[in-house]
Amino acid sequence: MWLLALCLVGLAGAQRGGGGPGGGAPGGPGLGLGSLGEERFPVVNTAYGRVRGVRRELNNEILGPVVQFLGVPYATPPLGARRFQPPEAPASWPGVRNATTLPPACPQNLHGALPAIMLPVWFTDNLEAAATYVQNQSEDCLYLNLYVPTEDGPLTKKRDEATLNPPDTDIRDSGKKPVMLFLHGGSYMEGTGNMFDGSVLAAYGNVIVATLNYRLGVLGFLSTGDQAAKGNYGLLDQIQALRWLSENIAHFGGDPERITIFGSGAGASCVNLLILSHHSEGLFQKAIAQSGTAISSWSVNYQPLKYTRLLAAKVGCDREDSTEAVECLRRKSSRELVDQDVQPARYHIAFGPVVDGDVVPDDPEILMQQGEFLNYDMLIGVNQGEGLKFVEDSAESEDGVSASAFDFTVSNFVDNLYGYPEGKDVLRETIKFMYTDWADRDNGEMRRKTLLALFTDHQWVAPAVATAKLHADYQSPVYFYTFYHHCQAEGRPEWADAAHGDELPYVFGVPMVGATDLFPCNFSKNDVMLSAVVMTYWTNFAKTGDPNQPVPQDTKFIHTKPNRFEEVVWSKFNSKEKQYLHIGLKPRVRDNYRANKVAFWLELVPHLHNLHTELFTTTTRLPPYATRWPPRTPGPGTSGTRRPPPPATLPPESDIDLGPRAYDRFPGDSRDYSTELSVTVAVGASLLFLNILAFAALYYKRDRRQELRCRRLSPPGGSGSGVPGGGPLLPTAGRELPPEEELVSLQLKRGGGVGADPAEALRPACPPDYTLALRRAPDDVPLLAPGALTLLPSGLGPPPPPPPPSLHPFGPFPPPPPTATSHNNTLPHPHSTTRV
């Protein structure tokens, strides 16, 4: 009898396991959630082998258990010759791989000189706790962490009780669950996905949450501007992780057709860049950008070669040939490379995403204007006081900021972002005027408040609003929020608002399980309620693309007080009203967030910058850094002009500054001041005339852009674009060109003569967009090297042969004929180092 009973138990176990060690029938969809909930160490089949996870209980009675799969490889380790290369798919492994402990973090220098102003406040305020998450570092760091719920979360149960309807198949365990992949921030230099436990978000929202490690700093973003080191390896790691999820997440009960990427800070910038990249097309459907976009000054590196040369010089790899230099860098230890102090210009980055013509095909704002992100639903927002770390250094005491400190901070801000001598005075005084509370101008606390608003508006608010507007211009779904709450923590100034990164504990449900080492807050019931609200919005968006559906806001099971969010309907953002949701203890839907200040940065400041360029065309500007790796000896035939093209050589070795960037001084002013009065009158009259012309051009350009948008949205019948995302077609024989393309074609023909500048031939006749003009700087640098090769769409294997010359937005532009004074003419739009 006992033998019969044993056989029956074994048969029942085999049926419960689905006939295989992975918990799913061979060839079936994968592990059933019932098996996940019953086994302590469940095993799942993937395309590369079996992985064993661990079931964990959460410290909250309303949350069910979660199975964690920690350290699942999504790519081959980028070691040896694979350093500075796109990631490859992981190799298969025999047997069962344990996925029960966190993987190593990617190499980084947590105690380096990276400016704290760009890091989240919880990171800098708890640096010792953050260091414990990155003590175990290795170049073999390309791993995912998966958090899979084992039963329906409280949102599903609450919905069923409230509506008395049958369970919604979209959010029950009988259907595939939405997937949310989190991209961590840290200025592309620091951080790890291990810091973010997705268990509460997964259990409460009934979604699968994934975090990942991707290559950082020099190992993730070093670029020489040519095929020796193309850059953007960190972005390609994220794309490879998305490929892995699309291929394998069904085995864990996830839906590969409902993948949402979300991130904060630099992670949000990566979200924005992945939206614009054709490499990630079809790999995800929705995106959430928390406190970051691709058009902030710190989002994209427009001087990659400059910092690569500085690093190479520091470690003894300063070679004349870029390939030799990269090979030398490959032979160095990761620790030696990461520990080098290569300081970026303030408000910028030394190693980060670059416009390579492939992964990032063009300037992100140009791609947005072309409608390259039409296929994605988007949720984007900012925190009330993002710029806290910018102001703390200027706050001399609890009494606020003195008048002299205010003036110095604004001057330093203008110097670091714009750098030109005469025009900065006008811009500096204009900024001071706009951010002075004239009703209480002598109040130090008010000066501190307006200074905080200045940095928040410039670095976060204006770029976020511009991004949302560009998205909404094409009638694509976008929701905008502002976050107005932060937890009570020691060391936080009483005057501080919700700073950079303060939304993260609420997104990941930390208040529901209590304080952690990274978030040592005194969480109240209000914090728990607000966290439930945020998780409901975020997971609703992942399920349907609408944060209001399918689960209504209701937290009576958490808080005895009524939830004010129950009566709020989060409206879509549109280009006219610009509606947004105020997320705080007193929620409300409003419109036109900080409209005056946003218009100041997006409209007036670029206009002032353009006026300066026109007025001071006689100013000789120093040559910028090149974008290709050139020999250190200057080429023959180089001659100076009023507006010199980017040279083919770097300054002499003695001119390379290995320390923090310092802007070079311009030649002295040689104007004749004997007739100051007449010159002043003449300049004043000229300014008036130029203002009239500029504003007339502005209104004309707005009308013109609206007309072009209508043409993009309503193409002529029978003429498909043939370009993903609605990009422009190439002029081809036998096809009638639209007026704007015909104009560019005529310019190309007209500029093809001997001695013509190809860069001028490729430049559109219409004036540059004001928000693009805002990013002009004295050391403008075009980015795409003429010899750059495209990456394979899969990111695997050797590069393909060079494609034929093309102006396709996803391919490289044809290089100019080599000359002694040739420079990078490969982009149709100029790029710069300074952004909104």
From Swiss-Prot:
Q: Which domain of life is it from?
A: Eukaryota
From the UniProt annotation, give the residues forming the signal peptide: 1-14
- Family matches, as InterPro entries: AB_hydrolase_fold, CarbesteraseB, Carboxylesterase_B_CS, Neuroligin/BSAL, Nlgn
Biased amino acid composition, Pro residues: 796-819
UniProt tissue specificity: Detected on hippocampus neurons, especially at inhibitory synapses. Detected in retina, in the outer and inner plexiform layer. Detected in pancreas, in islet of Langerhans beta cells (at protein level). Expressed in brain, spinal cord and dorsal root ganglion. Detected in brain, and at lower levels in pancreas islet beta cells.
Feature: compositional bias, Gly residues: 717-728
Extracellular face residues: 15-678
Please list every transmembrane segment annotated in the UniProt record, as residue ranges.
Answer: 679-699
Q: Which residues lie on this side of the membrane: Cytoplasmic?
A: 700-836
Glycosylation site list: N98, N136, N522
Give yes or no: UniProt keyword Phosphoprotein.
yes
Q: Where does the record place the region Disordered?
A: 623-661, 711-735, 791-836
Kindly state which keywords UniProt assigns to this record, in alphabetical order.
Cell adhesion, Cell membrane, Cell projection, Disulfide bond, Glycoprotein, Membrane, Phosphoprotein, Postsynaptic cell membrane, Signal, Synapse, Transmembrane, Transmembrane helix
Q: How does it sit in the membrane?
A: Single-pass type I membrane protein
GO annotation terms (biological process): gephyrin clustering involved in postsynaptic density assembly; inhibitory synapse assembly; insulin metabolic process; jump response; locomotory exploration behavior; modulation of chemical synaptic transmission; neuromuscular process controlling balance; neuron cell-cell adhesion
- Does the entry annotate any disulfide bonds, and if so which pairs? C106-C141, C317-C328, C487-C521
- Where does the record say this protein resides? Cell membrane; Postsynaptic cell membrane; Presynaptic cell membrane
Spans annotated as Required for interaction with LHFPL4: 679-699
Query: What SUPFAM superfamilies does the record tag this protein with?
Result: alpha/beta-Hydrolases (SSF53474)
Q: Which residues carry this modification: Phosphoserine?
A: S714, S719
Oligomeric state and partners?
Interacts with neurexins NRXN1, NRXN2 and NRXN3. Interaction with neurexins is mediated by heparan sulfate glycan modification on neurexin. Interacts (via its C-terminus) with DLG4/PSD-95 (via PDZ domain 3). Interacts with PATJ. Interacts with GPHN. Interacts with MDGA1 and MDGA2. Found in a complex with MAGI2 and IGSF9B, where it interacts with MAGI2 (via WW 1, WW 2 and PDZ 2 domains). Identified in a complex of 720 kDa composed of LHFPL4, NLGN2, GABRA1, GABRB2, GABRG2 and GABRB3. Interacts with LHFPL4; leading to mutual regulation of the protein level and synaptic clustering.
Q: Which family does it belong to?
A: Belongs to the type-B carboxylesterase/lipase family.
This molecule's function is given as: Transmembrane scaffolding protein involved in cell-cell interactions via its interactions with neurexin family members. Mediates cell-cell interactions both in neurons and in other types of cells, such as Langerhans beta cells. Plays a role in synapse function and synaptic signal transmission, especially via gamma-aminobutyric acid receptors (GABA(A) receptors). Functions by recruiting and clustering synaptic proteins. Promotes clustering of postsynaptic GABRG2 and GPHN. Promotes clustering of postsynaptic LHFPL4.
Q: What is this protein called?
A: Neuroligin-2
Native organism taxonomy: Eukaryota, Metazoa, Chordata, Craniata, Vertebrata
